[in-house]
Amino acid sequence: MPELFAYTDGACSGNPGPGGWGALLIARDGDTVVKERALKGGEAETTNNRMELLAAIHALEALERPARLTVVTDSAYVKGGVTGWIHGWKRNGWKTSTKKPVKNEDLWRRLDAAQARHEVQWEWVKGHAGHPENERADALAREGMAPFKPGKSKAGR
């Protein structure tokens, strides 16, 4: 049975500013890539953390059936949030340990729902360190951001 991986990344030009997200879904049988799907998108005004979250969300939501997969991210924010902090946030009514509202609550809720139907293992990799699939996810995120960068006409979107 093929192993499924989702490599995700977000990018932002300014923080906040125009941003993009990218996700690369790969099914592997050993070292052989059986199937691959690239996803990308962007927004005119966003933050890097929102784009990182959306990359993971879109990767999980793109899967038509429940699956066992590894999501690989270079975002300590996403990995730390989804594997640890989120449990406390939910217990505390979406408040942090200091009783402040959780930033990006809308996306954390969506990510929580998206991962609930799958068996997900989360893995962190160092960004911009030559990891081929992470570099490809980064390129997709930058492509997703491109139509929203200053100087691009709205007709080109």
From Swiss-Prot:
**Pfam families recorded for this chain?**
RNase_H
Question: What cofactor does this chain's UniProt record say it requires?
Answer: Mg(2+)
What does the entry's cofactor note say about binding and number?
Binds 1 Mg(2+) ion per subunit. May bind a second metal ion at a regulatory site, or after substrate binding.
Q: What Gene3D superfamilies does UniProt report for this protein, alphabetically?
A: Ribonuclease H-like superfamily/Ribonuclease H (3.30.420.10)
Where does this chain mainly localize? Answer: cytoplasm
Q: Which family does it belong to?
A: Belongs to the RNase H family.
Summarize subunit and interaction data from the UniProt record for this chain: Monomer.
What is the protein name given in its UniProt record?
Ribonuclease H
- Could you tell me which species this protein originates from? Dinoroseobacter shibae (strain DSM 16493 / NCIMB 14021 / DFL 12)
